[in-house]
Amino acid sequence: MAPALRWLLLWVGSGMLPAQGTHLGIRLPLRSGLAGPPLGLRLPRETDEEPEEPGRRGSFVEMVDNLRGKSGQGYYVEMTVGSPPQTLNILVDTGSSNFAVGAAPHPFLHRYYQRQLSSTYRDLRKSVYVPYTQGKWEGELGTDLVSIPHGPNVTVRANIAAITESDKFFINGSNWEGILGLAYAEIARPDDSLEPFFDSLVKQTHIPNIFSLQLCGAGFPLNQTEALASVGGSMIIGGIDHSLYTGSLWYTPIRREWYYEVIIVRVEINGQDLKMDCKEYNYDKSIVDSGTTNLRLPKKVFEAAVKSIKAASSTEKFPDGFWLGEQLVCWQAGTTPWNIFPVISLYLMGEVTNQSFRITILPQQYLRPVEDVATSQDDCYKFAVSQSSTGTVMGAVIMEGFYVVFDRARKRIGFAVSACHVHDEFRTAAVEGPFVTADMEDCGYNIPQTDESTLMTIAYVMAAICALFMLPLCLMVCQWRCLRCLRHQHDDFADDISLLK
């Protein structure tokens, strides 16, 4: 999750110019097509959207536009912790489950949580350690009173990890001092007995078990003042705000309640199917994660997708480093040729048997604008699709095109076109369906698990085999040592004789 400053090459027109950019990321911690009718077949639908329960949908004026951040550095919400309240900016992360805040001085923090100043802090006398792919943090667990000023008007007692040491976790200039993990208890650290913040919120206040995110990053101009270069968005706690999206909400089941795991059944580049076994798209999982910047794909899928994107955008040549996220490409301000880049379509399992829907992602999402480059006369971008060793991650650049509903009560995630997404006059982001898709359950990757009783049986058998081999070996060793002792006595005597000579 930490930034790694690098010297990057900027591609301008037909030449290459050196420039300094910022290689930013938020964290740290995928075979033939499906059988069945063609996915292009649209089915009739009686209604665009099923009715919502009272209180789950409506206007949440006080929560609209309560997120801030910077492109590539995450979205944060203002929270207060302790008594008297200490105000902190907290990164919104649907890919983890710990509520953790900086609790010691750090070069990248302007402020931090001071437990000794809170009369309501309770020490749990337990430590916690969280490693990421790049970076880590460790701290001490406790509980305190927490509220969200631009959220529901409630205060809850929640578990807090006070970060005392970290490495490559906090981001210089990001303006956030902690992380709010909104996923499930199964992936909480140190173990699943630690109740996550959102679980505590629902349990103590009876707020509906649902939240929704509108991330508007790409819609904010860059290469201007720091204030204007900020990104924004909304986190709606307890329901759905219909003013934040257009069209219909389409839902995909949450496959397993740990990360927000979903099932991708098909991937297209400009309408062309990658024609891979759908298990490859979900190897070893597919998750929706606001705490990761990029769309991350398993190795085979990434290679196939990049090959197709290269072919579709072949009217211009880009350095290999661009496709690896190591170099930027630049055009004169206002002349970015969006039309040469293809759209990416992800088909997600629907709620109805044998039906799926697709979300269409624009190049304005997967080409991430980068600020702080050598010249402000150019618009520069980083390729925000990258390779993953831990499955597909639908990160912030994907979510920025959509209003995403995390309906935990009904174990599903909804997608609709965001009212703030960036597009041109020719194409817009889209959520469409339904499509006929058979055997979608087969697309989910099942991590091999061995029954515990089987493991115990294997352990006993191995122990018995070891004992059978070790017994004669021990006897042989004992016999050898006895013989050696006898020889040793004779050898000592012989040596004495030699010395006497």
Curated annotation (Swiss-Prot):
Domain of life according to the entry: Eukaryota
Modified residue annotations for Phosphoserine: 498
A GO CC term attached to the entry: membrane raft
Residues the record marks as active site: 93, 289
Molecular function, one GO term: peptidase activity
Record text on activity regulation: Inhibited by RTN3 and RTN4.
Residue ranges of domain Peptidase A1 in the record: 75-416
CDD domains in alphabetical order: beta_secretase_like
Short sequence motif DXXLL: positions: 496-500
Name of the featured protein: Beta-secretase 1
Species annotation: Rattus norvegicus (Rat)
